[in-house]
């Protein structure tokens, strides 16, 4: 099943909580987003979201995935295709 799914590194932005306690308004206004890096098989991609899955298991006839994440497309900064032959699939997935 996964032979046709590209292995990718996704760089994306996420919300970041501030520390508890009192802080100056100036310091609060300087807060930044967290930059995240996630790897896995690119399972789905459209204009609103991408889904990557990090783990895959086969046992008898069961095929299951784990550690998947759905990321809003607007949060994605970059998608790097990790295997040379997957770079050709880049055009298929955006």
Model-assigned labels for residue ranges:
Residues 2-94:
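Conserved RNA-binding domains used in RNP assembly and mRNA/RNA metabolism
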